[in-house]
């Protein structure tokens, strides 16, 4: 779907092919030529298709190195926006983690890919002609996925790639699929022979004046599951043509009294952006609510073999109507309702990444 009109809640569908074609990642190499071995040139990522969204003040750019392949995706909010960070799992790759950001950088390359965020910071400083007044500081937070297992090089997103992703940023467009940070994302790592390539995904909803944009790069040990409970990406058995939920592999292992097999090197990174003003407590709870909801579309999620990070961002542009009965202590029913809707938008984004 290239355009997203104003939606009612009942219009959230998250449609995806019932039996998408297999996209096996192949066995990992865990090494190979690095950045210095190539004459690297950033490429603008266009992906499978372009999502069009209507969110003034928010631009997105994606760039990649074909030699990786690996990439970076930048969400740029020039005016800056308050941010809550929810990080879970056993191996989180995160820098910044600020409560106010001008850009969010998502990248491949594991910890090395955090350099892409430094490139975004450098570029923003140059745009301000190197002014460094405290109120003018440009804040960038970054999160990375471990994508080396799905490719045969040690190339990682560096400063030049982060700069390029920022330069490519435009309002109202997001490249779906194998693009930016999702170039070599994968899912279903019960066994390397059954791991499938995913990508990056986004979804957008507008409800009256309320805007919600979800962006995700699923690279989990788990599989991607649709709303019917069907595994649509990951843990694909080429001999049978069946995608299995990992729970069946784990059950068989316990029944046979052998350790369950699960491969390491997994992460899902995401951002949920809205224009609704929330208190700091509400924004933090909003982040937790949406992040927790993602276990429906990614199973299992937040494991010791993952390092999941979600950025919840608000541009603080509109206030939802309130009534004396709409709050419980410090938390508003409005924020809870917004989180419920945003959770569905995020599930749509996860499914887009799995197409």
From Swiss-Prot:
The keyword Hydrolase applies. GO terms for molecular function: aminopeptidase activity. Its EC number is 3.5.1.117. Keywords: Hydrolase, Nylon degradation, Plasmid. Pathway: Xenobiotic degradation; nylon-6 oligomer degradation. The active site is at 267 (nucleophile). Optimum pH is 6.5-7.5. Expressed as an inactive precursor that is cleaved autocatalytically at Asn266/Thr267 to generate an active enzyme composed of an alpha subunit and a beta subunit. InterPro entries: ArgJ-like_dom_sf, Peptidase_S58_DmpA. One of its GO terms (biological process) is nylon catabolic process. Belongs to the peptidase S58 family. Heterotetramer composed of 4 alpha/beta heterodimers. Exists at the monomer/dimer/trimer equilibrium in aqueous solution. This is 6-aminohexanoate-oligomer endohydrolase. It comes from Paenarthrobacter ureafaciens.
